[in-house]
Design a protein with these regions (language model features):
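Feature detects amphipathic, helix-rich regulatory segments
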Residues: 1-167
Length: 167
């Protein structure tokens, strides 16, 4: 991997879309997401085929996550679809390393705007290298998750043993 990385605006890498109200929709199989994650399922999708990155517009603005299509997002959550050949996992890694709270545009409830997201300056390589880097970090995140589960299980076992040691 020796290609030159270019400084670009995040808005050049993604399309930023707004969530919408879901209350007029019937129950179904399409997951609805808000800033806190999964909420319920409805009958229609805002994004049928394109996976995206969810980022809070209001409330929790510093916890991006990947949305697998099809999905619906509420109006407090933007969904960002990588443009052209930009890699979803690579762009997600960028999102995870941005100090979103420092871009809060409110005096009350934390808020982000499409403009604030679009203007963020990032370094990005060509799409082939993005794909390799994105896949590497996806696998790394998976390993972290597996080890975290194991750690949680061991902590629960320790707690159980300590509670029952003197019974």
């Amino acid at each position: 991997m020796t290609t030159v990385w270019e400084q670009r605006k995040l808005g050049d890498l993604i399309d930023i879309c707004s969530g919408r109200d879901y209350k007029h929709l019937e129950d179904g199989d399409i997951p609805v997401y808000g800033t806190g994650g999964y909420m319920l399922s409805v009958s229609e999708a805002l994004s049928e085929n394109d996976d995206a990155i969810g980022i809070g517009r209001k409330g929790t603005i510093d916890k991006p996550y990947i949305l697998k299509a099809p999905f619906w997002t509420v109006d407090t959550l933007f969904y960002c679809i990588p443009r052209d050949c930009n890699d979803l996992n690579f762009v997600f890694d960028i999102f995870q390393n941005i100090s979103w709270k420092s871009m809060d545009e409110s005096t009350g409830v934390p808020s982000l705007s499409k403009t604030a997201i679009s203007k963020v300056e990032v370094l990005a390589p060509k799409s082939e290298e993005q794909g390799k880097i994105g896949q590497y970090f996806k696998e790394f995140d998976h390993l972290i998750t597996l080890h975290q589960r194991k750690c949680d299980e061991l902590q629960n076992l320790k707690k159980f043993m300590l509670q029952n040691m003197f019974v």
